[in-house]
Amino acid sequence: MDAPSSASGPTQPRLSPADALAALRASAPLTQCITNYVAMQIAANTLLAAGAAPAMIHTVEESGAFAGLARAVTINIGTLSPAWVDGMKAAIDGATAVGTPWVLDPVAHYASAYRSAVARDLLSRRPTILRGNASEILALAGGNTAARGVDAADPVTAAGAAASALAREYGSVVAVTGAVDLVTDGTRVAMVSGGSPWMPQVTALGCSLTCLMGAFAAVTAPLEATVAALTLFAEAGARAHAHSEGPGSFAWRFLDALAAVTPDDLTGTERVSWNAP
């Protein structure tokens, strides 16, 4: 089901997942990914399989200038150091200066005081899209969570109100990812279903999803970009699962499936429901 009418950014059209995938593959948007050590290779391969062009540029000496050239920027705090944080801030400043969309993934921001402070600082810079699991989004909005590491300890539906509050406060589209994903801009809500139960057993798939959201934000408005990325992930995950025996075979079949999914496969998909809690 296509998205209902919604406000979009000044330059990006509102596209269905099918049209967004076609636009992404037609333009191969250059996407700057400042992600963690664990995720770099799989994130780059994910973007290549989907049809985008990754660039893993993170040093402060060049990240800001490169962000001015990229069509989207993604920030993931999975493996932090002061030097990397400086590079993140420079990239955000570079993207903001030219109106380039950027995505924030506050991985396990509740795990330490330093990590929490960095996440809060980056969030205050008003990301175009904010992606996290339910525990990350709940904690970022000031709620309680039992999570301590990178994995969620709360169901997606428990973070719905927190996601809406964050979206309204920061003007961001917020995605809460899990077995069923929730996306909101503070007013509209979409749920995306599909994927595979093996996805949480393959490291860095969520981090790669953050990068893919950035790539889609280069070709369509933020809400639609987020839904398109989730829909493509869900479709590819379901296809890979059908031919896999476990998380090992799923990991490489998932990349094949990403490359094989066509815009027609996402046309009229029933994976997306709008304004569903």
Curated annotation (Swiss-Prot):
Keyword Magnesium: yes
Binding positions for substrate per the UniProt entry: 56, 204
Cofactor: Mg(2+)
Keyword set includes Ribonucleoprotein: no
Catalytic activity, as annotated: 5-(2-hydroxyethyl)-4-methylthiazole + ATP = 4-methyl-5-(2-phosphooxyethyl)-thiazole + ADP + H(+)
A family per Pfam: HK
Pathway field: Cofactor biosynthesis; thiamine diphosphate biosynthesis; 4-methyl-5-(2-phosphoethyl)-thiazole from 5-(2-hydroxyethyl)-4-methylthiazole: step 1/1
The family this protein is said to belong to: Belongs to the Thz kinase family.
Protein name (record): Hydroxyethylthiazole kinase
Organism from which the protein derives: Gemmatimonas aurantiaca (strain DSM 14586 / JCM 11422 / NBRC 100505 / T-27)
